[in-house]
Amino acid sequence: MGTIRYHLCIPHVDGLDEYIKKYPGRVVHSKYYRSPTVYSGQKVLTIGNSASGSDIFNELTKTAHLPVYSSRRRKSPFEGDKPQPGVEWKPIITRYHADGTVEFEDGTTLGAGEVDKIIYATGYRPSFPFWNERANGRPIYDYEVGKLVNTYWHTFFHDLPTLAVVGIEKGLTFRSFEYQAVAVARLFSGRNAIPLPPAREQRRWEEERTEWVKATGKKFHDIESEPGRLGEDSFKWLGYLYRLAGLGTLTGDGRVPPVLSKELLHAVRTIHKYPRYDEDAAGGEVYGYHGGSSTGGKHAAKDWVVVDGL
């Protein structure tokens, strides 16, 4: 299964339901975002500053009415100490008022006339509407805990040996999915280099991972997703899938998981996704990479690397 995170995730806020009814079409999810030109001249509030949210509010600075408001729980580690030009940071929304006012955690507000569109870039929840719990004897996902049930290595199931999931984890996105896909294909075609461990060892892995979650406060399927880090957890995760898959055939059939090259590792460990203010530059200009723009110098765009999904 690869159709995992698809159900829209919009957090509950007091007054949101009434606000949506009063202003139909004003609140949308980033799933339906296609082009910044749709929002030309509009006053936009975006919510969320992970990959999609950041891309959206940065694109909107070229077309929307400025500033573009960006509501977030905290500053992203990808960002500098100040918002980029054209963006104004706001804390989380605490209430939508009946008169159309949007109230934030710090007590500030945006009136009904100050917002034309609100874009929730708040991600997706795992969704398995096709899963027949009665026929399969159990649920596939525990929504209270936030994990696959009876999972091994975020991919396999110790009680369902012919089922696998690709894409539930949060880590080195896309690259890790590719490792999973190759490992699953090898296993199900009988060409895996090493066997899966016995069910009891798979259960032990799940139990130990659960204890790790309790000890660290992290999510079960999160694998070192902070920028600049690709350490023990990531190497164990990808390394096992690599060993399980093994090499392709002598004649070249079968994909080999792409290696973590020195260039990739350097990119991850020195990542800067958005421009930061150069206090030494005239006028406090920004440097770095975004949309191909740069003020030049030693921090020119060519010296920066963009790696999404960490």
Model-assigned labels for residue ranges:
Residues V28, L45, Y69-S71, I119, ...:
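Hydrophobic/aromatic beta-strand patches that form the interior of the parallel beta-sheet core
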Residues N49, R73, I168:
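Cofactor-binding loop segments of dinucleotide-utilizing enzymes, especially the Rossmann-like FAD-
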Residues R125-S189:
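Glycine/threonine-rich phosphate-binding loop and adjacent beta-strand/alpha-helix elements that clamp
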